[in-house]
Regions:
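Active-site cores that bind ATP or allylic diphosphates and position pyrophosphate for catalysis
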Residues: 54-178
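N-terminal Rossmann-like or analogous alpha/beta NTP/dinucleotide-binding catalytic cores
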Residues: 1-77
Length: 178
């Protein structure tokens, strides 16, 4: 269900399957294996300092678990497994990319090999951006709630309602008054 929906959205956005490798993360056991190796050399302090971890702990203190703590290591494994050097990320993922470089360099030193190149952010603009959510507070994304983002699968009417309710600078609007 969900995998097919995501694939349809990728294709609708113009991703060319002849030029792009599309895969299901859970179908690649090497990612989990690399995650384990990287985890064994990730330090608690650096993981606890992760901005995303601290934000999630503040938002939901009753659900602090190892998966949440080590999520940046999984993201690093996703990047490093491909030996990627250019990674399309937003401003909010910059710290995770820095951690991926740290974990990759640590792995290289430990095994005295330059296997993982350093990954860097790829963007078409001069700086990384963070797309704000419709509520004007956090980022736009599925983890921030159904009504805080516009989805490709949203109907035109749903999109219109979401946009009309979106947080703005508070200035008057001349068009689209309910």
């Amino acid at each position: 269900g969900h995998v097919k929906d995501v694939l349809v959205e990728y294709l609708a956005c113009g991703i060319d399957p002849e030029e792009t490798t599309i895969y299901i993360q859970s179908d690649v056991p090497e990612i989990a294996e690399l995650y384990l190796y990287l985890n064994m050399n990730a330090y608690m302090g650096e993981l606890e300092r992760s901005t995303s971890f601290k934000d999630k702990v503040r938002a939901n203190p009753d659900n602090v678990n190892a998966g949440l703590l080590t999520y940046p290591v999984l993201m690093a494994a996703d990047i490093l497994i491909h030996r990627a050097t250019k990674v399309p990320v937003g401003k909010d993922q910059e710290q995770h990319l820095e951690m991926a470089r740290t974990f990759g360099n640590r792995f290289n030193r430990l095994y005295q090999n330059e296997y993982f190149p350093e990954p860097y952010a790829f963007t078409y603009s001069k700086s990384l951006v963070k797309v704000p959510g419709l509520d004007g507070k956090g980022k736009m994304g599925k983890s921030e709630g159904e009504n805080n983002a516009v989805y490709l699968s949203d109907s035109p009417e749903i999109i219109r309602k979401k946009v009309l309710k979106a947080f703005t600078d508070g200035g008057p609007t001349s068009e689209f008054q309910d």
